[in-house]
Amino acid sequence: MGQVFLLMPVLLVSCFLSQGAAIENQRLFNIAVSRVQHLHLLAQKMFNDFDGTLLPDERRQLNKIFLLDFCNSDSIVSPVDKHETQKSSVLKLLHISFRLIESWEYPSQTLIISNSLMVRNANQISEKLSDLKVGINLLITGSQDGVLSLDDNDSQQLPPYGNYYQNLGGDGNVRRNYELLACFKKDMHKVETYLTVAKCRKSLEANCTL
């Protein structure tokens, strides 16, 4: 009986520590989701602002090219649809999110074009990407889902953006900015989806469907 009473304080402390860790983990998820939502909205605004400067024929042509082309970050293996996203582990979603954010650290600096509003946005984006990367890394470190086995594709470095755009023609600057902004918007939407699903899983909500 004495041993039981001795164990009770230990169990209570352990329970409080576990609850504290869960609360802190949820706080970090809330911050990460909020920041990527802001980045996604910012990316959407920047793309819409740039798209609004294009002539109708120019817009249609660039949209056709983008649909046939690919983003630099497409080499990062990620879920192809909602079903695969929901089947992925929390740790896998965090790792993919980290890779996607990391892939934009350099390209985000080249989003600066003539519009002064976009200059301010681009500077803001670089800082927010860096903060979000740190936050996701903390979530990965604190994840209890086990060890993720990364395949060979995950360990490969992305091709540099300089090579990605080196073959563009005379209208390269317009196409380059269009593709950068469109890809950035697409990737921020991916990260927002992955972090939202991961956060829901960690909060033990009954329904985490997309």
Swiss-Prot record:
Any one GO molecular function term: metal ion binding
UniProt keyword annotations, A-Z: Disulfide bond, Hormone, Metal-binding, Secreted, Signal, Zinc
Compartment(s): Secreted
Signal peptide location: 1-22
One GO biological process term: positive regulation of oxygen metabolic process
Keyword Signal: yes
Pfam families: Hormone_1
One GO cellular component term: extracellular space
Binding site residues for Zn(2+): 38, 192
Intrachain disulfide bonds: 71-183, 200-208
Primary location class: secreted
PANTHER family: SOMATOTROPIN (PTHR11417:SF2), SOMATOTROPIN,PROLACTIN (PTHR11417)
Entry similarity comment: Belongs to the somatotropin/prolactin family.
Function: Growth hormone plays an important role in growth control and is involved in the regulation of several anabolic processes. Implicated as an osmoregulatory substance important for seawater adaptation.
Protein name: Somatotropin-1
Organism for this UniProt entry: Oncorhynchus mykiss
